[in-house]
Amino acid sequence: MSQNNYFRSSIYHCVETNGGFKPVYFEDGLLVVDSDSGKIIDVGNFSDIGLGYDLSSNFIHFTDRLIMPGFVDTHVHYPQYKVIASYGASLIEWLDKYTFVEEQKFSDNDYADQIANLFLDELIKNGTTTVMTFCTSYKQSVDAFFNASEKRNLRMVAGKVMMDRNAPEELCDNSEDSYKDSISLIENWHYKGML
């Protein structure tokens, strides 16, 4: 039998209404989460729903915190994690001097794994739980990202960059191989866990 996890805190979320969403705030709220599935099964004012549960175990009271849904970033490039805020007088200069140099490192599986883990840890630290990210033209950059995401049970959307021009030769791939790699990635990762 599944146990629940209980979190008492201020809680903010939105509920769907006719034609939109309405913000809901509980100054002293209770969030009830199924420990097996990780799904929220109840939320409300502590005084309204707290007596309906056995709070003798798996109970955490955050007196100075706010619980809210994770943030979603709809456009990010995880391979550019280490070159964020690098200066370039123009986009092309920035790509040539920083981005393409960094992305070539993702041909190494260990490096791709390392950056995927650093990137995801940074997202979580800042409250972002879902992203839509570009990877690199290397298939292993996508595998590294999805492996790290799956271990954290995060919902992610990602894919392999298909690039056959205007970049260093090491980053370019031909259309046929890129297509085959993309099909393989889709077959391996699509709908796997939260991916």
Question: Can you say where each PLM-predicted feature lies in the sequence?
Answer:
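Metal-coordinating catalytic core of metallo-dependent amide/deamination hydrolases
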Residues: 140-195
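N-terminal metal-binding scaffold of metallo-dependent hydrolase/deaminase domains
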Residues: 1-53
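A short, small-residue-rich loop immediately preceding and capping a beta-strand
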Residues: 107, 129-138
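Active-site gating/metal-coordination segments in enzymes
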Residues: 96-100, 104, 121-125, 129-130, ...
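Active-site gating loops and adjacent loop-to-helix segments of metal-dependent hydrolytic enzymes
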Residues: 84-112, 165-175
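Hydrophobic faces of well-ordered beta-strands that scaffold small-molecule active sites
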Residues: 70-74, 131-133, 156-160, 195
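Divalent metal-coordination and catalytic microenvironments
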Residues: 31, 38, 64, 75, ...
